[in-house]
Amino acid sequence: MKKGLSRRNLFKYMGVGGATAVVAGCEKKPEKLIPMLVPPTDYEYTPQTAYQYMTTCRECDAACGMMVTTREHRAQKAEGNPNHPVNQGALCARGQASLQTLYNPNRHAHPLADGKQIPWEEGMQQFSAIIQAASGAIAYLGKPASGSEGDFVDEWLQAAGGGQRFKFNLLTQKSQTEANKIAFDHADVPEYAFEKAGVVFNFSTDFLENWGNPVENARRFTDMHVYKNGRKNKFIHISPQVSLTGAKADRWIVINPGTEGLVALAIASVIQKENGTYKFLKKYLQAYSPEKVAEATGVSAEILSELAIDAMEHGPLLALGGGNVSATDQSVETLVAVNILNAVSGALNKTILFSDQTAPESSTHQDLTQLISDLNAGKIKLLIVDDSNPVYALPPSMGFLQAMKKVFVVSLASQKSETTHAANLVLPALTAYESWGDAFPRNGVRSIQQPVMSTVNMFDARAREDILLSVAKSVNKKAFSGNSSYLDYLQNIWQKIQRKVGDRRNFDSFWISVLENGGIFEKPKFIRASLNRRVASVKLNDPGMAGSDGLTLLPTTSLLLGDGSGANKPWLQEVPDPMSQIVWDSWMEINPDTAQKLGINDRAIVEVSTPYGSVQATAYYHFGIHRNAIAIPMGQGHQHSGDVADGFGINVMELLPDQMDKAGSLVFVGAKAKLKLINEKSYTVNTDGNARQLGRDISAATTVEELKHPEKHSAGHNRPVEFYPDRSETAGYYKPYRWGMTIDLDRCNGCSACVVACYAENNLPVVGKVRTAIGREMSWIRLERYIEGYGDDFETRFSPMLCQHCGNAGCETVCPVYATYHNPEGLNAMVYNRCVGTRYCSNNCAYKVRRFNWF
């Protein structure tokens, strides 16, 4: 725990200070408050009234629609925009926590020059001077733009004398678009119609976590996988590791790391032999028959043939590929193989739909290699960086930090990071909650980003685009003529959009409707795609791995922290990882069989070494990992990203090589690691208690066959015998109704968005790692994870646990001061100022959901 003034002592000092103020100010005349009983009709704001603003979430590239509720000119809660066709009112855990970007006390509050605070005028003068001195030798490094921002920056570079824009995103889909170009002549990411599929084959893609749009993927996948009309469609996870996505699978096929493409082609060979489609593939696929790839993949020919039969009998098929776990130097070839499987099985133009739009911007690490080369060669004199954090996110073996130190760096970021820490000049930018923007994430979807509140007064920041526009005008009088702000520039773009969509209203009316709706949403227009013959020339080889021996290192994406940009948000640190239930830390997944052979106990500290670096991590026993592999999640291990992020966990990127695939994307699975036991026990905090149900049937499950016979208990779930008899007045006690809520556990995927939303909605305290270790966490909803079975045939179940509002609640009967009581609607209510802190309620709660605020 960090030292400082405790909350208890703070209130003591406040009490003394308050009494002193009363004595000293006793002669001051009272001020009268005049209540606004009849507010004026032209008043734009009514106190104590909630207002909703539609905007766009910027926590990842998915650009979901967002609805932000404000009161007293302050944003209070973020939800999904129900008008948005992509996320349809839903929001992921990171979107729910995005408010902590806005109110983060570690935001840059003032401009900084070499770490020292300076006035804005001085900062802008320095920026203008270095632009003029650079004479066009400028590089702008920022996130890929899905809206107007990219064109704006390109125009700005021209106005500033020249330069080049480099796009950076650690988690990119460039390999996928390259594979789609090879297979279908469409360098785009298609729309995946999960709901039209009868069976889904997932080749190591974490589509419920960070791949594509997880919110949309979750909705469409659930529509496919949920039990309805007497049947349940199949989901098969084909991967060396079980992630949150894999935990929802009906079956896990364990494969050797990096062999996803071979498995896909083996399945395709059986299907092609059966249906005879795409005859030009016959000879090509014969080389990848189940018998020929069984040894390399670690999957028997019988199982590979079974998968092909599943695809033919339960189709249409949807095969998915991509993501970190399959990101070897053969990523493009692997994704081409998955495309071949989709085409051969008939999924193309059924469950995989291409549009005629230009693909959104994506980044390649090959471009960054060129940037690093130019920085080292002295070809660049000024480097401008936005909120992206390449110093942290890139493998140190690339040498970005060393190259960056050779030029003058200007950071236009809102948050602290390792990159801004190394910058010469920091001009703090506003967050997406306070600035204008837009996003065009897919065909027919144009989302607007508007400021939902004025700038938080403790942060002296400006909109990034307005900073650029202002400095451009100072060095070039002709720059952006007619645009006094980025809003003017944006409205000019949207006037063109208005004409394109054929809206005949005046622009003011059109603009207001855009702001009210959150954008313009048209029905997508799809085109037919076909498989290109060139795929038969794509060869799959064994993926290259640095290190002669050891275990294959699988860097996995974090559901909550993403690429590490969410690490300085306390809610995301305090919410347990759904699979490991670990908080405020990193860990290394290892198969128990492998660990025991190496003499490594669960939760021991292990040194993980590759040819590129070494870290110390906590061993976490996980049945869902290949016996010749380990997995470490990304996102932790920060040093200069804020009080919440710094000092927790490790950065797995320190173990990776500077290696690219054929699309120029970073190779995540390219090294083997050696393990060395350091300590028998680590200080790692997890909240699951016991991962096993121990026969208590807390998270019950059944099969589709049993559901067809409701007379059986497992299908009907007959009411268990109650310990207490029914209350005599129950029948007529609740008038006119009794509150109730149902959670469909078949739909729950463990995404933890509800847990983060509860923190935001109820303003729950965050207690930190130390207090969580002794059971003082304050979350009102927890996501329980239970494991059934052992070995490769294990099963993961998720069960959200919250107050059950019991009809005969144990907490109510033991409270000596009646602080908790039963209201007429059946709710377990609470009078907080009655509570004296006995905590009898917590002891007597059967579900252990009562919380006590130890602060």
Across the structure, where does each feature detected by a protein language model lie?
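N-terminal export/assembly segments and adjacent metallocofactor-ligating motifs
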Residues: 1-274, 283, 291, 300-302, ...
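Domain-level signature for respiratory redox metalloenzymes
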Residues: 2, 67, 192-199, 233, ...
